[in-house]
Amino acid sequence: MILGDAIARACDDNPDFLFETSTLTGGQVVALGKRVAGVMGTPDACERVKAAGERVGEPAWPMPLPDDVRKGMESEIADICQTNSNLDRGGHMLQGGIFLREFVADGVEWAHIDVAGPAYHTGEPTGYWTKGGTGVPVRTFLKLIDDLA
């Protein structure tokens, strides 16, 4: 909910682009593992994130936000439910992205980067990753800012 509020507040400033991140769901780890972040949002923003991540060694993969998953998130008492109980264990990352999308203003290019897996490295050092917090997606954000400047 707090991330949704932050997205809505950021949209009050009418940004051209909105990129944000969190360790949103364990579903990201199930779908993409511990090295590849999941990215959800508008198609152009997702492709920008994917391209920037590739250039700086922080791979990200665009994920769909299917309408049928959104339909299962209807609520009798709220604008949207955080989960789709019809999916059982599947699609958790997609549900998270769909939930966040509800807070994005129309016309804003937006991408959420789910770094539940890549945020923390427990294996042997590789590339610029040592054990512990990786800093993903800071390099991606810096590349995005550079590309947009």
PLM regions and their residue ranges:
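A generic structural signal for tightly packed, nonpolar segments enriched in small/aliphatic residues
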Residues: M1-A149
